[in-house]
Regions:
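Residue-level signal for well-ordered alpha-helical scaffold segments within enzymatic catalytic domains
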Residues: 74, 87-90, 94, 114, ...
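Catalytic phosphate/metal-binding cores of nucleic-acid and nucleotide-processing enzymes, i.e., regions
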Residues: 25, 114, 139-144, 191
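Acidic, Mg2+-coordinating catalytic module of metal-dependent nucleases/exonucleases
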Residues: 99-109, 114-120, 147-196
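Active-site-proximal helix-loop-helix substrate-binding element of RNase H-like nuclease domains
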Residues: 50-53, 60-63, 134-170
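A short alpha->loop->secondary-structure connector
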Residues: 120-131
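Conserved non-catalytic scaffold segment of RNase H-like nuclease domains
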Residues: 2-11, 15-104, 153, 196
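Short, glycine/charged-enriched secondary-structure capping and boundary segments
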Residues: 24-26, 118-121
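Short, function-defining helix-loop hinge/capping sites that tune catalysis or transport
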Residues: 20-22, 42, 115, 141, ...
């Protein structure tokens, strides 16, 4: 009998930009799903305080994005990065995840992982080294299944971290039902567990 697969830890971050040299995290949201993409609990969405100088360093596009989403007005009342990391780790432990077992999931999540590795080392160590990146599946669908790609659900997250995660989960559910169709293999039982 196959063992139960670890949960997925979905993370989305909003930053002042994409540069690890100068930009900072200003929002992080986390949701946990089981391996069937069912959301476990309510998730957590945290705004992180940035200095006026850090906000002044944002380019026009990022400034407009965070203004339109309403995030810009919440940042001055945000919490510290350390407080955010503590809250996230407590949420993950309460959600039934175990250190080093659950992959990070999201859209273009390598960017988020770089900021997490820089600013939240305990969270980075808590995550499995593997990643489920929905944007990779989207790129493959665009090349190999364009009809499915163009019929994908529209995003509604409005560049807020929790909404973006919810969009990513819905997008992966869509690709799962449209592309990842279960094949029956005659005369073979799947192995109980694969080690790789």
């Amino acid at each position: 009998m196959a063992t139960e697969l670890p949960h997925l830890i979905w993370i989305d971050c909003e930053m002042t930009g994409l540069s690890l040299e100068k930009d900072v995290l200003v929002e992080i949201a986390v949701l946990v799903t089981d391996s069937e993409l069912n959301v476990i609990g309510d998730g957590i969405d945290l705004v992180i305080k940035a200095t006026p100088e850090q906000l002044a360093g944002m380019n026009e596009f990022v400034t407009q994005m965070h203004t339109a989403s309403g995030l810009i007005t919440e940042i001055p009342n945000g919490i510290t990065t350390e407080e955010a990391e503590d809250a996230i780790l407590a949420y993950l432990q309460a959600s039934g995840t175990q250190p080093g077992k659950s992959p990070l999931a999201g859209n273009s999540v390598s960017v988020d992982r770089n900021f997490i590795a820089r600013d939240m080392s305990r969270l980075n160590e808590y995550l499995h080294y593997r990643t489920v990146d929905v944007s990779s599946i989207k790129e493959l669908a665009r090349r190999w299944y364009p009809k499915i790609y163009f019929a994908a659900p529209a995003k509604t997250g409005n560049h807020r971290a929790l909404g973006d995660i919810q969009d990513s989960i819905e997008e992966l559910k869509y690709y799962r039902s449209s592309i990842f169709i279960e094949a029956q293999i005659q005369g073979q039982n799947p192995p109980a567990e694969k080690v790789d």
